Amino acid sequence: MDQPTRVTPSAAALSAYSEAAIKNAAELVDEASLLAEHRHFARAYFLAVAAIEETGKALILFEAQGRNLKDPAVFSRLIQAWSDHGEEITSAFMPSLATDREAVRKNAVALANLMAALRNGREPAMYSDIRSDNQKAQLPSEVVHEVAARDCVRLAADCLTDARTYLKNRTPTQYTMEQDKLFALKRTHYHRTMNNPDFWWFFVEEAEAGRIDHAAAVISYRDKFELVGKSFRKETS
């Protein structure tokens, strides 16, 4: 199987990859359901999580078609996104979250905990290990319980259904140059800007002038001030 880095940076290639991922997700959901029916709950849980990951990968690849694929930094970040289990899981929930924003507001903490549980439960559902608290060996069948496995299989099926609807009815978002730059920006650099009070003074002035695009504000601030060692407040005071 080709490694992700060997994918051609073209919309056609990413479209084909997205279609393959969603088909594989459907197969994984079917297989997870069969395992649950035969009470192989640990393996059912593992395959259900894998199905959610593949669903998320399909969505990442779909949205990637609207980015500047000729930019090496953007494409490198895309490879990182569809190769990361956590990002895949988060992306798998995006269609359902987008259609029920009120539920997101009410259940934000529960949703965050659910995504974390899926990320953390993946490996214990497949591999034996030594518990860190008492140094005892544990089997996946001892860790994953029936309710958790069946719930995870249903969740995988729901994510798949929502993703199929999204992929059928939408076109890839067309991202601006600033949005692509923000997407490719290292997380440490982004968080440094977000934690800089001077940026927020800049952002408030931009918003008051009717320029409320977050990506454009971040990139503009970094180019005009942060990267050249200047302060917005000092320059405008």
Task: Give the residues covered by each predicted segment.
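Terminal alpha-helical segments
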Residues: M1-S237
